[in-house]
């Protein structure tokens, strides 16, 4: 009997694309807490409003340097119909052109069932949770710990976390240091079922 393919979503920056800047997450958390006038009571992410901020936001995303090691395993599992894969990036609409450039570079149309960017500029965790529910995903591979927690608490999908050197001490079972490690876990899950 043919197995139903696992439905898996992938974040773009820091997951499908290697992004060394993600190691600065702890630094940005400390800076935000110092600069913030009031205590943060919920998950919220910065949104660039002015044209200048949007230009800076584009420059910041240039830190996604190349396709991450492990991408070839997504291609194999997709080609073999073991997974239905989706790109769900919280990149705001001001980054649409760069998103499309990466889709072309990755030949995403031949690998992924669909690719979505945050064209309505929702808060990233809200956008991703909505798409995950809409698509009925089994897993979502994400490098932001706050978003992983939000996914686990607000969807039926299991968040697979690509951690970093500073956050690796946070206890979590489905924690990996690279896309390649996360894909090995997914392959084991498929082979086990």
Label every PLM stretch briefly:
Residues 93-139:
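Substrate-recognition "cap/lid" segment bordering the active-site pocket of phosphatases
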Residues 17-20, 25, 94-98, 148-150, ...:
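Short catalytic/ligand-binding loop motif for oxyanion handling, primarily in non-cytosolic enzymes
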Residues 137-177:
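Acidic, Mg2+-coordinating phosphoryl-transfer loop and its flanking beta/alpha structural elements
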């Amino acid at each position: 009997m043919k197995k139903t393919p696992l439905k898996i979503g992938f974040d773009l920056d820091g997951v499908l694309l290697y992004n060394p800047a993600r190691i600065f997450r702890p630094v940005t958390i400390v800076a935000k807490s110092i600069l913030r006038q009031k205590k943060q009571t919920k998950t919220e992410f910065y949104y660039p409003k002015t044209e200048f901020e949007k230009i800076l936001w584009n420059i910041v995303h240039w830190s996604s340097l190349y396709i991450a090691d492990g991408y070839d395993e997504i291609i194999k599992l997709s080609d073999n119909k073991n997974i239905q894969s989706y790109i769900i990036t919280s990149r705001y609409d001001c980054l649409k052109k760069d998103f499309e450039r990466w889709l072309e570079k990755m030949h995403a149309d031949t690998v992924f069932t669909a690719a979505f960017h945050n064209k309505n500029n929702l808060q990233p965790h809200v956008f991703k949770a909505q798409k995950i529910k809409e698509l009925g995903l089994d897993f979502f591979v994400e490098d932001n710990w706050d978003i992983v927690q939000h996914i686990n608490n607000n969807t039926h999908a299991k968040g697979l976390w690509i951690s970093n050197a500073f956050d690796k001490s946070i206890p979590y079972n489905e924690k990996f240091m690279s896309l390649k490690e996360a894909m090995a876990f997914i392959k084991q899950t498929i082979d086990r079922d």
